[in-house]
Amino acid sequence: DAFVLSSPEYHGTMSGVMKNNLDWLSSEQASGKVFGLMSTLGGRTNSNTLNHMRIVARWVHGWVVPEQVAIGNVESAFDESGQLIEESIRNRVSGLAESLVTSTVKLRR
């Protein structure tokens, strides 16, 4: 009932692997489903990849929640155990997950 899309950003857009996967996603599979979006970047945070994934999700008639997460400087964003270091980013990921679940439940009614 929901999708979480997460992609690294390469040359200002989603990865080729993500784009290829989305090219195979049909509106029959995605119509009415809820989408949550995340991206990672080697440098400063921006919204290019998130915006491009949003366009594709809308094109296949999906509902994208307004919360989104972009993790910049990804090489230093996680500790040795793979946990996000910054509490503000952890809170944003939690907020995205909460919005995704809440929206999915509401659309199923």
Predicted regions and their residues:
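Helix-loop-strand module that forms the ligand-binding subsite of alpha/beta enzymes
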Residues: 1-60
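Glycine-rich phosphate/pyrophosphate-binding loop and the adjoining helix
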Residues: 63-109
